[in-house]
Amino acid sequence: MDQFKPFIAKLATGSSLTRAEAEAAFDQIFAGEVTPAQLGGFLMAMRVRGETVDEIIGAVTAMRARMVRVDAPTDAIDIVGTGGDGHGTFNVSTLASLIVAACGVPVAKHGNRAASSRSGASDVLSALGVRTGLDSAGVEACIRGAGIGFMMAQTHHTAMRHVASARVELGTRTIFNLLGPLCNPAGVTRQLLGVFSQAWLEPLAQVLQALGGKHVWVVHGSDGLDELTTTGPSFVTALEDGAIRSFTITPEMAGLPQATLADLKGGDPETNAAALREALGGKKSAYRDIALLNAAAALVIAAKAKDLKEGVLIGAKAVDSGAASAVLAKLVALSNQDNRAA
């Protein structure tokens, strides 16, 4: 408790923590050694000043050290968003993940229940019949047999129980909104990572660069979505071969029509699950288009497609052939066959 006070004192002066200081501070937080008052003061001091790249690297390092790991193929990918964009859209990354798995790229999907929308990845998967909350062996069996496994944040980041009530009571974004997508329990080095603000594109790419990321796109839609959007341009900061570059993409570059935000709105988990099943069944819609765009980006990241146009064609074939629907059926069967849910 007393060991934590110097970190608060430093932040109170407007100074930032070094990488080592941030790691030490978050190690104490994840060990449950910090009082609620200390935690609240610490998080808000950091938020008001603005979290630095070194502070995030230190926090991620501490969080990764305590996570319950999953063994996945080295070429596995995660399609994930920070959430918190406030738009309540359809579960784009979940549908995109199923499409990518059907294209032969292993997917180690990390997610949670809804934060700002009515239906998070875990919510819609449960509505589809997938058993979430599996332990590492259960997730590994799903990845082996279905090409995709879902890792529930609470199951694999048990240390987060020490911050759960403070996050709810603060009721505003903190550094923890950024940490989850940066701490995939399967240790993926390939990611399509959507963020709630364009300001975080470069910083998060720098964090992943420092922590061994190989090929990552950090993305934000011009409409505010934490995904590649089909309503207009999307901003991308890519990490590849150790180098970072930024560019803009449009749905037209992928051969897709433009949509409106209203077209992309989601509902409750059951509504979104029904729409997802329809999309997997080949129904043409704005949901299908935005999922194909994000799947195409993941296929480019995974070196399965040379560009977005080719990625969309490969993804559409996986949907229209029934392969993506078959992936979901396998995931449902394997997740329920395993009795190791936490």
Curated annotation (Swiss-Prot):
Catalyzes the transfer of the phosphoribosyl group of 5-phosphorylribose-1-pyrophosphate (PRPP) to anthranilate to yield N-(5'-phosphoribosyl)-anthranilate (PRA). Binds 2 magnesium ions per monomer. Its EC number is 2.4.2.18. The keyword Metal-binding applies. GO terms for cellular component: cytosol. It catalyses: N-(5-phospho-beta-D-ribosyl)anthranilate + diphosphate = 5-phospho-alpha-D-ribose 1-diphosphate + anthranilate. Belongs to the anthranilate phosphoribosyltransferase family. Mg(2+) 1 binds at residues 93, 227. Keywords: Amino-acid biosynthesis, Aromatic amino acid biosynthesis, Glycosyltransferase, Magnesium, Metal-binding, Transferase, Tryptophan biosynthesis. Its cofactor is Mg(2+). Pathway: Amino-acid biosynthesis; L-tryptophan biosynthesis; L-tryptophan from chorismate: step 2/5. 5-phospho-alpha-D-ribose 1-diphosphate binds at residues 81, 84-85, 89, 91-94, 109-117, 121. It holds the Pfam family Glycos_trans_3N. Anthranilate 2 binds at residue 167. Gene3D superfamilies: Nucleoside phosphorylase/phosphoribosyltransferase catalytic domain, Transferase, Pyrimidine Nucleoside Phosphorylase, Chain C. InterPro entries: Anthranilate_Pribosyl_Tfrase, Glycosyl_Trfase_fam3, Glycosyl_Trfase_fam3_N_dom, Glycosyl_Trfase_fam3_N_dom_sf, Nuc_phospho_transferase. The gene is trpD. One of its GO terms (biological process) is L-tryptophan biosynthetic process. Mg(2+) 2 binds at residues 226-227. One of its GO terms (molecular function) is anthranilate phosphoribosyltransferase activity. This is Anthranilate phosphoribosyltransferase. Homodimer. Anthranilate 1 binds at residues 81, 112. SUPFAM superfamilies: Nucleoside phosphorylase/phosphoribosyltransferase catalytic domain, Nucleoside phosphorylase/phosphoribosyltransferase N-terminal domain.
